[in-house]
Amino acid sequence: MSVKYIFVTGGVVSGLGKGITAASLGRLLKARGLRVTIQKFDPYINVDPGTMSPYQHGEVFVTDDGAETDLDLGHYERFIDENLSKNNNVTTGKIYWSIISKERKGDFLGGTVQVIPHVTNEIKNRIYLVGKEGKTDVVITEIGGTVGDIESLPFLEAIRQVASDVGRENVVYIHVTLVPYLSKSGELKTKPTQHSVKELRSLGIQPDIIVCRTEKRLSKELKDKIGLFCNIPGEWVIQNLDAESLYEIPLMLEEEGLANIVCERLNLGCVKPDMTEWCELVNRQKNLSKSLTIALVGKYVELHDAYLSVVESLNHGGIYNDAEVKIKWVNSEELTEDNLEETLCDVDGILVPGGFGDRGIEGKILAAKYARENKVPYFGICLGMQMAVVEFARNVAGLKMANSSEFDANSPHPVIDLMPEQKDIDEKGGTMRLGLYPCKIIKDSSAYRIYESELIYERHRHRYEFNNEYRELLTSKGLILAGLSPSEKLVEIIELKDHPWFIGVQFHPEFKSRPNRPHPLFKDFIRAAVERRYKQQENKND
């Protein structure tokens, strides 16, 4: 069977959920026995989002091979349960970087380098490349941005050409649009969708399927109207209603018949999907019997997308433990000695995620101190681990001026320091310790109990590490170095003695958690938090 290509575009406004639509369709096709991969094209000129502010871009998702990518790749991996690579996220910056490099080498033999054919050919090559990896049956490609954006034009022209290259029978175009509801008149308005499709058709792309984001159900008459004006059957107009949980959306789109239409259009046969596991997952999530509160202490808390994978991983752990996880967003810049007790006294666990820069670090250190002293389950990820080490050094080991050299280059006790191989690097983009690395776990540790393995592989994104000059002192005071790199030069996991659950990790476990396979650390962190909550309730009742 030849590879099939599905392109997902968006219209009217951004943020409609193209990524979730693509991920959900991927899940539905995989449930039909097809081998699926998903790809995202981002029209911005940055080579990758690694140096972009979380306020502008949200989370940076890291793949096994060390690519810093769009957060939608996290959705893709969680929904289709496959590990993606650097080839699954392509930006305008990457495209132009590649073309200019080729031009400088003389690869174009003196020709004039133009958007068509050179840029469009480079884009198409990236599409075909993922289709050749892993014996893929279906490639789903999401085009970032909105139809009408000047930045998207080369990508739209490239996907138009794909139909000519591989045959129109092997391509499906899906357009995601907004059907707004006017509460005053009680009407759903289709005109924005009509104009968006008109714009897309003016570029040579006739959508096969239109997915309508809406807060109210679409009647058959309304679907037929959209179909009439957009030149498709009314049955191929799909409603995508607001949902309480992201994981309901594949089931809602299955009910609408999206995957069946795609299979019919691509001649993939009519195979009944096996959605048993997914249905059970959603059913469990809807019927959780317990609840708990986790404080997420960070500096980007105004934009929840900055910690998207962490939040999803907490939810995965909650579903596994039959507990609804309520997140208390705590701005680390505003956390002080004066409000520490008041802010954290009602939480069942504290999580300090990764980050960069000195803003808000003292608040994170205070959160680690509160967790240590009050026996509250503490989970430190990347910077969260480093701040736990700084707190321990200051308040347990007596190194009052301890700090990370990232924040205080003149600290007399830099218990966290720049990795040696990073010291001669001037460029910021793509130069950190990135991607999957092994870690050896000592047997007599909580980490070994949780992982049930002496060797694990986790994804990393950092420049700074535990300073080995302080190993002996800090371990003598009760810090456990539970996980090390195979060379034993890098500290990967720290724990505390005499604490119910206090673990810091240099890596990012949130990037490997899946709804059907929660990450072991998140599973056990939530277990410990649930245990603490219900023990406290029992003590109050006594």
From Swiss-Prot:
Provide this UniProt record's keywords sorted from A to Z: ATP-binding, Glutamine amidotransferase, Ligase, Magnesium, Metal-binding, Nucleotide-binding, Pyrimidine biosynthesis
InterPro entries per the UniProt record, alphabetical: Class_I_gatase-like (IPR029062), CTP_synthase (IPR004468), CTP_synthase_N (IPR017456), GATASE (IPR017926), GATase1_CTP_Synthase (IPR033828), P-loop_NTPase (IPR027417)
Species of origin: Acetivibrio thermocellus (strain ATCC 27405 / DSM 1237 / JCM 9322 / NBRC 103400 / NCIMB 10682 / NRRL B-4536 / VPI 7372) (Clostridium thermocellum)
Recorded hits in CDD domains, A to Z, give: CTPS_N (cd03113), GATase1_CTP_Synthase (cd01746)
Q: Which biological processes are named by the entry's GO terms?
A: 'de novo' CTP biosynthetic process; pyrimidine nucleobase biosynthetic process
Known function: Catalyzes the ATP-dependent amination of UTP to CTP with either L-glutamine or ammonia as the source of nitrogen. Regulates intracellular CTP levels through interactions with the four ribonucleotide triphosphates.
Q: Write out the pathway annotation from the protein's UniProt entry.
A: Pyrimidine metabolism; CTP biosynthesis via de novo pathway; CTP from UDP: step 2/2
Region described as Amidoligase domain? 1-268
The catalytic activity, as recorded, is:
UTP + L-glutamine + ATP + H2O = CTP + L-glutamate + ADP + phosphate + 2 H(+); L-glutamine + H2O = L-glutamate + NH4(+); UTP + NH4(+) + ATP = CTP + ADP + phosphate + 2 H(+)
Gene from which the chain derives: pyrG
Instruction: State how it assembles.
Output: Homotetramer.
One GO cellular-component annotation of the UniProt record comes to: cytosol
Domain named Glutamine amidotransferase type-1 is located at: 293-535
Q: Where does Mg(2+) bind?
A: D72, E142
Report the GO molecular function annotations. ATP binding; CTP synthase activity; glutaminase activity; identical protein binding; metal ion binding
Please identify the protein, giving its name as recorded. Answer: CTP synthase
One Pfam annotation reads CTP_synth_N
- Miscellaneous section: CTPSs have evolved a hybrid strategy for distinguishing between UTP and CTP. The overlapping regions of the product feedback inhibitory and substrate sites recognize a common feature in both compounds, the triphosphate moiety. To differentiate isosteric substrate and product pyrimidine rings, an additional pocket far from the expected kinase/ligase catalytic site, specifically recognizes the cytosine and ribose portions of the product inhibitor.
Task: List ligand-binding residues for ATP.
Answer: G15, L16, G17, K18, G19, I20, D72
Family label = Belongs to the CTP synthase family.
Superkingdom of origin organism: Bacteria
EC id = 6.3.4.2
Q: Does the keyword Hydrolase apply?
A: no
